Amino acid sequence: VGERTTRGPGLRASLFPLTGPLRFLLLSSFLIPLGSFMVLPFMSVFLHERLGMGLGTVGVVLAMASLVQFSGGIVGGALADRIGLRRTMLWALVVRTAGFAGLLLALRWPPLAIWALVLTCCGAALYLPANKAYLVHGVDDERRPAFLSAGNAALNAGMAVGPLIAGPFVLSSPGWLFAAVTTLFLAVTVGHARLPGTEGEDPTGSRETVPSGLLAGVALLPFVANALAFYLYFHFQHFLAVYAVERASSAFYSVVLLLCFTLVIVVQPLASGLIRRMPYALALAVGFTGLAAGLAVLAAGTRAALLAGGALITLGDIVLFLKNDLEALRRSPRSDAVVFGQQRLAAGLGACASGVLGGQLYGLGERAGHTGWFWLLAAAQCLLLPPLLLVLRRRTARRPVPDGDHEGALTRDDTDGRVPGR
């Protein structure tokens, strides 16, 4: 019995039985990215080919949209803290549905496309922190990793299937595609309106003891670690396409992406308990080592290297992204929604830095005729930058903690992988 308590429940025992609202929320975690990825991955092609925008303008629009979608999560978390989780998800879906309807109208009035795209990204920014917080609301500590992993698996499944369904129709029948996605989001919005609220728990009840600023109570180490993880991972996300298509084909690039999605869908739920119990320092070491190994393997440029590198990078980010979220929840005194919003901001900052700095480095490698060096340099950063987190960890550990408020503090056993109740 003692061993079972230490190891925690298995995946099946953690997830089941599922209540009706949680079943619907997990289904929505699949349907929402399914609809979104029927459209968003093709926006550069749609804006350029169908609406005639210049590539420079397209790049600026997509960069602005990505920044809103990631970094706006901190506003979504704060809004959920103020008006409640269900209301925030509902308003976010209304905004996002309006965005997809706007894309349909943009076929008649092209300038509307930019604002419609921004609306969809604003909706995503508002929705995700509240969605994650609702998913783990009232769930005991040992089951939280399983629920977060199941939500991530559903999200990645939707991201994988959406482009496969929509690819043939983006340029040939975009009107029908946008109408179908808008209808899907309308249905999901109606379903969310029927979810039970969590406001009875008083989402703002901690305001008297916790400052209400957007970054107040941030768990600094998981925040910085998340920004660094996304910075390094997005070297792969941003630049694999041009590298893989050049050395293999666009079809093979799709195979690599499908492998990565499949690994997240299958491995993260199964490994969630192990990741929860893993000491934080060990999880960071394992995750960044996986990223380093995968990025280094990509430098070979062969088809086998693309598959192996993608797999190693995905396994590394499975550990890093989940563990950083769990540690942020454990260390911060803020509500779950605010914590997820803060972590989303960190992800946005990291992804943005990767696009700016990584783009310059990849351009240098391309001009020199040795783009393989780009991946080796990225791998070296995976080994050289994470040790700087140790300095931050020691500095945070020395910070005094007021009596009676130790939940977000670093303690002597802060790496035991526990996710305390909130």
PLM segments and residue spans:
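A late C-terminal transmembrane helix in Major Facilitator Superfamily
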Residues: A337-E366
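C-terminal membrane-cytosol helix-exit motif in multi-pass small-molecule transporters
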Residues: T183-E201, L388-L392
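A membrane-interface helix-boundary motif in multi-pass transporters
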Residues: V170-T183, Q360-C382
